[in-house]
């Protein structure tokens, strides 16, 4: 399954379109009555959604409401039920995919937003991987934690120059923290969960400060 946060060389709308496969995977898993796989696929959608939700909300509050406040919580809750009604949740995910595709089509033909919103989306898309690390560690899923951090490192190369231009201090702190996380998480057979979690939190704080500032600039310029 291709992640829609992994790499993006075109427009943000192009990056957003790659979110659809996670919903398609959820549908396929439900059709095959594979609930565990459906949960994993929808979790992947949810993680990626964090990267694009500000962009979507700015584009259309109605679309945001449907996806974020109606479909997403309803499907998430349904997937957690011990006696899952597969046909019911399948209908919801299929309807969500239709709404998602309609939104992408609308955004593609709309007047471009302030370019700063593209920057916000790029920053958040990359950050989505880092957000996955701590929950994976706490769940004891070391493989996922490592994979998510490696994906964050991969995406970082696409935006590190932008971050550096925004804040040299934040850039240096993120770079330093990433080296420390790599040593503690990737190079250790038995990582210290508390230590790695602390390091991830430190990088996240620095990264979030840049995201927050760029979001403020985007809203002021809109």
Where are these regions (language model features)?
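Mature extracytoplasmic or organellar-lumen-exposed domains after removal of signal/transit peptides
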Residues: 1-222
């Amino acid at each position: 399954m291709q992640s829609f946060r992994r790499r993006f060389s075109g427009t943000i709308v192009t990056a957003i379109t790659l979110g659809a496969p996670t919903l398609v995977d959820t549908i396929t898993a439900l059709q095959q009555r594979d609930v565990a796989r459906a949960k994993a696929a929808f979790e992947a959608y949810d993680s990626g959604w964090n990267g694009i939700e500000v962009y979507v909300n700015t584009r259309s509050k109605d679309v945001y409401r449907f996806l974020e406040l109606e479909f997403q919580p309803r499907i998430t809750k349904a997937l957690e039920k011990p006696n899952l009604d597969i046909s019911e949740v399948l209908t919801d995910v299929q309807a969500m995919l239709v709404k998602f595709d309609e939104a992408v089509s609308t955004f593609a033909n709309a007047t471009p937003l302030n370019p700063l919103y593209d920057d916000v989306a790029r920053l958040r898309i990359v950050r989505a991987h880092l957000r996955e690390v701590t929950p994976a560690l706490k769940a004891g899923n070391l493989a996922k934690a490592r994979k998510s951090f490696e994906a964050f490192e991969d995406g970082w190369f696409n935006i590190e120059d932008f971050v550096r231009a925004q804040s040299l201090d934040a850039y240096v702190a993120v770079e330093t923290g990433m080296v420390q996380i790599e040593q503690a998480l990737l190079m250790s057979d038995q990582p210290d969960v508390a230590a790695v979690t602390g390091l991830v939190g430190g990088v996240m704080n620095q990264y979030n400060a840049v995201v927050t500032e760029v979001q403020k600039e985007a809203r002021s310029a809109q």
